[in-house]
């Protein structure tokens, strides 16, 4: 019975309409099988988040749509790193950081506009994106802290610490499958910290003039 329910569920993912935005990526002829396999769990998540106000995302586009676009445009490996960066930034501190850099808001729901591709590349700070990325390669989270976002850096460290500890504990208990799963999650967030440090230093800086993030 459980197998039948799973089959029906995944069939529904394939034939559903555009209520769930990532479904369009699943049906897109430009997305390969690996990208679609990675986007599939995001599409499943949207069936929960889009039907519960408690799971509403503060960003526009939402983290699930952002992740789906990242995977579709950059492939599953880089796309997952980009998604991990967004997940780390989607914290209680996001609104204050958004105000600091004169970020724009999406109306009428006033979500924080944070596009995948940022067109305004003007950087008024003296922070080096490459140096920030290098710091996070050595100590995850430190690159974001260097770039001026201490709490984002702390959140990144925390995510890696949690998943890394879970992986280590699983291997200690000879739970290989669980250990491998958490190892992959740790690697994804580690990659996300490197990308996130670079992106933070390059784009998410407090402006010295009236320029906005587009």
State what each model feature region is:
Residues 3-13:
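Sec-dependent N-terminal signal peptides
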